[in-house]
Amino acid sequence: MECNAKPPFQWELENLISFGTSTAEVPRKLKPMEWEIDGFDCTSLYSSSFAYAGSSGSDIAHAFSKSSKSTSISSSSAEVRTHNFTSETGESLPGEFAKGIDTSPSLELSFGSGDPVLGLKLGKRTYFEDFWEVENAKGLGLPVTLASSSVSPVKKSKSIPQRLQTPHCQVEGCNLDLSSAKDYHRKHRICENHSKFPKVVVSGVERRFCQQCSRFHCLSEFDEKKRSCRRRLSDHNARRRKPNPGRTYDGKPQVDFVWNRFALIHPRSEEKFIWPSSKHVPSRVLMPQPAKTEISDTEHNRFGLLDPKTKTARAELFSKEKVTISSHMGASQDLDGALSLLSNSTTWVSSSDQPRRFTLDHHPSSNLQPVAHRSAAQLNSVSGYWQPDPPAVEGPTALHRNGVGQFNENYFSLNQFYN
């Protein structure tokens, strides 16, 4: 009776990659092995050469321990007989595989002839000179002898990083060692002296080192006696010359927060504000008046000083004022004649509401109309600098001795409100 069933160690041996002595052939021939069973002859297969490709050493030892056993079965008991496996070289395995098993075989893996390969262990991987990689080398204690002519590399390993080169100055003719220099000069590979030179030769081209860009530029990109290139200098100057945010921007008046008030700030320096004398402005109205000789019509139009609507409103106001004065004068002619005998300078005018006092010059009959004209002209000059139109005053107007027109108390309170 023949035993057709394959023992479990046969499946493990078939999965191993076996290498021969030549690279062209990868022999996978399996030689028959006799099993001694009482009353039966069973054959099994074993590999002529073994190779390790990615499995752990414990698996190989387990496979060899299984393959080393032969079974003898009798009707009464089963006897285990061991056979020694030997490779083509006939050498035995190290003692690690035979721990705890006195009868386990010993086998040494060899791949041709040659000296043992030196490897570099990085983490869990070991890298060899001919790109042969052995994983889990900690669990495998086999002295591997590898022939570079007989085995082709399976996987390319990472090359060993070379030692860092000592930095030197890249200027031609310098070649100064920068190992003891500053980090800045080591990084950009230039010595401290050549970083300030106006002209150096790098790779056969005349250049200059920019201390802000940290790069070499052509000589045309530098200004004379400047260590930074023209582009960096322009950016630096633009950052330094930023306009003050509290000042005028794009020719528009801005708010002055320094004095906690709204002020019209104009960029032109020729504008000057002066305080006029008290001869041209009423005593109760104080305001800054721009010099007429230094402000053109364009400037007046910009602030709305010569608006046609403003002119029309002022003309209507003055015409109403003249009519009011003349009507009051006509109604009180008799009283003027009586009072003129008592005083040449003071006249009382009767009105339906209440009497008003007029202060005239020495000749009231001849100077009344010119005083009214002067009052209108002075009102023109005073109210012309204010954009909002003042409301019309219906009541009579008091005229002082100095010949300057003045509105009633309502107009003065309005002027104080605008101030």
From Swiss-Prot:
Compartment annotation: Nucleus
GO CC annotation: nucleus
Induction (record text): Negatively regulated by microRNAs miR156 and miR157. Up-regulated by Turnip mosaic virus P1/HC-Pro protein, that acts as an antagonist of miR156.
Cofactor note text: Binds 2 Zn(2+) ions per subunit.
Entry-linked InterPro entries: SBP-like, SBP_dom, SBP_sf
Zn finger (SBP-type) start-end: 166-243
Free-text comment about domains: The SBP-type zinc finger is required for the binding to DNA.
PROSITE patterns for the chain: ZF_SBP
Functional note: Trans-acting factor that binds specifically to the consensus nucleotide sequence 5'-TNCGTACAA-3'.
Encoding gene (name): SPL2
Protein name as annotated: Squamosa promoter-binding-like protein 2
Residues where Zn(2+) 2 binds: 210, 213, 217, 229
Cofactor: Zn(2+)
Disordered: annotated span: 77-96, 230-249
GO molecular function: DNA-binding transcription factor activity; transcription cis-regulatory region binding; zinc ion binding
Residues holding Zn(2+) 1: 169, 174, 191, 194
UniProt-listed GO biological process terms: anther development; negative regulation of auxin metabolic process; regulation of DNA-templated transcription; regulation of timing of transition from vegetative to reproductive phase
